[in-house]
Amino acid sequence: MKPLPLPKQKNLRADCAWVIYQILEQGKSSRECLERVQRRHNARDNAWLQEMSLGVMRRLPLLQHWLRSLLDRPLKGNKKVIEHLILLGLYQLNFSRVSNHAAVGETVAAASYLNAAGLKGLVNAVLRNFQRENLADKPVDDAIINSGLPKWLFKAIENAYGDDAEQVHNETNAMAPIWLRVNKLQTSLAAFTQALDKAGVEYTLSANHADAVILTKRVDITALPGF
C-alpha cells in the first residue's frame, strides 16, 4: 500500500483515520503515528485521538465484519483511508460516548480533509445504513469475530487454555481500570476525592497504595479535576 501523507489541515477524525491507516496498512506503531498527529492538537483532543484509534484496534474484527457487510466492494489506492474513516465512524456509533449526530456528521465532513470529498456521500450512506439495519443488535455467529482478537491469537489461546479459553478471551478484551496517583505536593487525597465527588466521577481507594485513586468507569482524563 502506498504511503499516505498526513492531511495538510488538521481535523480530529481525518487525523484519527490517518493513524488507523498507518497502523493497519503501513505496519506503523500506534505510538509513532499518534505522536505525529498529537503535535497539532490540544490535550483534550489528543486524549480523544488515543481513545478512538486504540478503540478501533480493540474492536477491529467486529468493525471489519460490519464494514464488509455494508460496502459493495473494497476501496482501493489513495481512497483506502476512507474505509478506515468508516471504521472510526462505526466505532463512535456503537462503542463511544459521541452522539450519533456528531459521529455521522463530523465523520462525513472529515472525508474532505482526506482528499475524498467525492466520497462523503458513501461515508454518510454506510453509517446511516448501519443505523437503519441495526447491525449492532444482530448476533454474529463467528467465535473469532466475537472474541475481538486476531485469528492467530484466538487459536493460540484455544490451544493453550482449552475449556478456559473463553474466559481468557473475555479477560483479554476487558479494559483495565484507570489508576491515579495524587501528588501531595499539590493537593491532598481528601481534597482530590472531594473534587471527584463534586464532578460525579466514581472511584475507589486502594488498600495497598495510600496515594492511589482507582476510577471505576472510563472517563475523559482531560475532564478530571486538576488536569
Residue ranges and their predicted role:
Residues M1-F227:
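Class I Rossmann-like S-adenosyl-L-methionine
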